[in-house]
Amino acid sequence: MQSSKTALDEIKEFLLCETPEEWIQAAIEHQDILLIDHANCEKKAASSAMQLIHRYSENYNLLQKMSRLVREEMRHFEQVTAIMKKRKINYIYVSASRYASELRKLVRKGEATQLVDLLIIGAFIEARSCERFSKIAPWLDEALGN
């Protein structure tokens, strides 16, 4: 018998708690800031993958995966900034949320544990992003909702 769980169900189980409704409302009401923040997150994800490439250059399996991730995240960055340009949203400074920085404080010292922790943190950040976009997608116009 096949499981009827969706990928989103699995993400919610992984995260253990859902994004507060207040965050959802703020994101819907301030889509310009949402787009700027999203562009920053895509750029940071690519940068984090590049840092792993530099730090763990002897790990060929990791190099291949991170290389693909850099390209994917930069393509997303291009897509978001193209939407911003079309909507005449200036790419202004928006401070980063504490979410990722607080998670990074938990990274253990030591090469083996540090890599594992960084990959797990990346998974949490990506899962949270997916969960949040699934919540706001019904409220966004077609260009952003897809």
Predicted features along the sequence, with ranges:
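Non-heme di-metal
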Residues: 1-146
